A protein has these predicted regions:
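N-terminal mature-domain "stem" immediately C-terminal to a signal peptide or N-terminal signal-anchor/transmembrane
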Residues: 25-70, 74
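Bacterial N-terminal signal peptides
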Residues: 7-20
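Structural recognition of the beta-strand scaffold that forms the well-ordered cores
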Residues: 32-34, 59-63, 99-102, 245-248, ...
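Alpha-helical scaffolding within the catalytic cores
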Residues: 44-49, 312-319, 343-351
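Extracytoplasmic/secreted envelope proteins and their assembly/folding machinery
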Residues: 42-47, 57, 77, 81, ...
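C-terminal soluble interaction/assembly domains
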Residues: 322-397
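Catalytic-core segments of thiol-dependent peptidases
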Residues: 88-122, 247-343
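Structured catalytic cores of large enzymes
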Residues: 69-70, 74-270, 375, 401-415
Length: 417
């Protein structure tokens, strides 16, 4: 997983002070449900969820788009974004809708815009140069030679040019794009700062909040998985989530006097995993187990798992967990929501859902580490009990128009007050 130079100067805010950013307790009538008429079971699951949660029938929008796990940018704009935008403008003039729920059967990923003919020609030329450079580097005896270093430097430059021509940084999760459906002309390259993110200090971002929707998805390998998630989430709310909280850091937590406020990338997130564990422990809600070894939790080491956050096993789920009904967790790695349907895939989101988790999140493509929800923030909001799953995600997730997907009942409150 890649790291950039961006770092977060977190503002540690009490939950009550954030009511201006995002109203407490998302309500059923504030959710717009999207179902895909081209996907078997999608409409049926949408109606099942809406009936169980008491969402008005008028809040269902039935669309027709591919049921594959990715779609072309043009199809997304024409078949998803445009009709949703039209609905919101014509039938939600009072702006009651705060959340979009994407149902089983929608693509996970929106491809970048296609290349022009001249861009294709240039990409083909660069591809040939890339192949020639790879062959040349392979012929050189020593990677330490000046000639090899120069070839490798040129190869890196060619790769970046190809990536730019293919507009690879304009691909995104469908869910992250649809959050900005009311912002018709936003920049596609890279990410857009999330104005709900509680870690940003910039007050001028508040003006964008009325143009942004929070988004969740009810999806999984099968229809039965989705129904289980719905049913378990609602049942768990009646008694509260029980079990243990597991946190899998890579390094021991440094002493407080060594804490670096400008900690970046991996170090920042590893420290945040430790802080999340401490928050859960102080709450007294669940017993906490922290692993700070280089080795991840191993098979069978995590019985009664209710909460989880850890890293790093790329696209290779470790069967360490016995998931409790209503459990919530995520694994910080680059590929963990690239598919929910490929049978042999071992990506974490798919496998956790298959094994019994009720809510998770992950990227559909390389996100960079700082695109993940900040662990200590996400779990603090979730533990509070006033915030729903979707709100906890929105408040702790730094970017929209990027790679992340939240899977779970948006109204779920595992520690409901």
């Amino acid at each position: 997983m890649k790291v950039t130079g961006l770092f977060f100067m977190l503002v540690f805010l009490v939950v009550g002070s954030l009511t201006a950013s995002l109203s407490l307790a998302l309500e059923p009538h504030e959710i717009l449900v999207l179902a895909n008429r081209n996907a078997a079971k999608s409409v049926g699951l949408a109606k099942y969820y809406m009936e169980r949660r008491g969402i008005p029938e008028r809040n269902l929008v039935q669309l027709w788009v591919t049921d594959k796990e990715w779609c072309e940018r043009e199809d997304y704009e024409k078949r998803v974004a445009a009709p949703v935008r039209e609905y919101l403008k014509e039938k939600d003039s009072n702006r009651e809708i705060r959340c979009i729920l994407v149902l089983y059967g929608f693509p996970l990923k929106v491809a970048p815009p296609g290349m022009t003919e001249s861009e294709k020609e240039e990409a083909n030329r660069l591809q040939k140069r890339q192949d020639a450079l790879k062959a040349r580097i392979g012929q050189l005896k020593s990677g330490d030679s000046q000639e090899a270093k120069e070839a490798e430097a040129e190869l890196e430059g060619v790769r970046k040019q190809i990536s730019s021509l293919k507009k690879e940084d304009q691909a995104a999760s469908l869910d992250s794009e649809i959050s900005l459906v009311l912002m018709e002309n936003f920049r596609l390259s890279g990410w857009i700062p999330n104005p709900f993110f509680a870690g940003y200090k910039a007050k001028d971002m508040a003006r964008d909040r009325d143009k942004v929707l929070i988004v969740s998805r009810l999806d999984g390998p099968t229809e039965a998985t989705v129904k289980r998630v719905i049913d378990e989430s609602m049942e768990t709310e009646k008694t509260g989530l029980t079990g243990k909280a597991y946190f899998d850091a890579r390094w021991p937590r440094p002493s407080e006097e060594k804490n670096n406020k400008k900690d970046v990338g991996y170090g920042f997130y590893d420290r945040s995993i430790h802080r999340a564990a401490e928050l859960v422990k102080k709450s007294g809600r669940l017993p906490v187990v922290v692993n700070d070894r280089q080795e991840l939790f191993q098979p069978g080491e995590c019985p009664d798992a209710a909460l989880y956050c850890g890293w790093y096993s790329l696209a290779k789920y470790v069967d360490a967990f016995q998931w409790r009904p209503g459990s919530v967790g995520y694994h910080i790695a680059s590929s963990e929501c690239q598919t929910l349907k490929q049978k042999e895939s071992q990506v974490w989101c798919k496998r956790m859902l298959e094994e019994g988790i009720a809510a998770t999140m992950g990227p559909v493509g390389e996100p960079y580490v700082q695109a993940f929800p900040v662990p200590e923030m996400f779990f603090e909001f979730l533990l509070d009990g006033s915030w729903t799953l979707a709100e906890s995600y929105a408040l702790s997730q730094p970017f929209w128009s990027w790679q992340m997907v939240l899977i779970g009942d948006p109204l779920y409150r595992p520690f409901k007050r």
